[in-house]
Design a protein with these regions (language model features):
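Short acidic-hydrophobic surface loop/beta-edge motif
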Residues: 41-45, 140-143
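Short, solvent-exposed amphipathic alpha-helices that sit
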Residues: 17-27
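Short N-terminal binding/cap micro-motifs at the start of the first secondary-structure element
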Residues: 13-17, 42
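Short glycine/proline-centered loop/turn elements that form peptide/ligand docking sites
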Residues: 19, 36-39
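A cross-family phosphate/adenosyl-ligand binding-site feature
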Residues: 45-53
Length: 187
């Protein structure tokens, strides 16, 4: 059965983190729904690149995915964190034991800020872990704690994406390894 991932974007998201993740998932035949958490599918990234999402979260808020991913970006994570629909969507996926994948500031500013880590280990960028009490910060590039996968930031985007892929495609590790080798990524 094909795995499905939702990528949650809001104005101000870190485009490099999002695009690398989406690319790796799609190379591995994982279905990706890029969902805008704003009122429109047209989004402006952290560095003012205009990107269109596939649809809005409001049209998919009752759907379940195998994983939910959030990139960083200061304003993007502020927008995600302040959106009650995003928090409810994440809570439903946590309760359903789905993968929650947070890159860069989203680990702290979305998950920890809304008490969604519940003591789990995670990593985040920029010293943001000092602002929130929820979760246990681990100073590593990528941290996996059960169904929670977090990465420090843009520089670890490939490692993060392949970590998520390996978790989702447990029966297809050779495919994941081949794709990593094919793009000259050592993991």
């Amino acid at each position: 059965m094909t795995k499905q991932v939702a990528v949650l974007l809001a104005d101000g998201f870190e485009e490099g983190e999002a695009v690398v993740f989406i690319d790796i998932m799609r190379r591995l035949d994982i279905e990706v729904d890029v969902l805008s958490c704003m009122e429109t599918t047209k989004l402006q990234s952290y560095f003012e690149t205009c990107i269109s999402a596939d649809d809005t979260l409001s049209n998919h808020c009752h759907q379940f995915y195998d994983a939910v991913m959030m990139p960083g970006g200061p304003k993007g994570t502020d927008n995600l964190s302040a959106n009650p629909m995003v928090i409810e969507f994440l809570k439903r996926h946590i309760e359903a034991d789905k993968y929650i994948c947070a890159l860069c500031s989203s680990g702290a500013k979305v998950l920890a800020a809304n008490h969604l880590l519940q003591g789990r280990n995670y990593t985040t960028g920029g010293g943001l872990e000092k602002r929130f009490e929820d979760g246990h910060f681990v100073d590593q590039k990528v941290v996996i704690d059960g169904k929670f996968i977090s990465g420090k930031g843009l520089g670890v985007s490939f490692e993060f994406a392949f970590s998520v892929a390996k978790a989702l495609l447990t029966d297809e590790q050779e495919k994941v390894d081949w794709q990593a080798s094919h793009i000259y990524f050592e993991h």
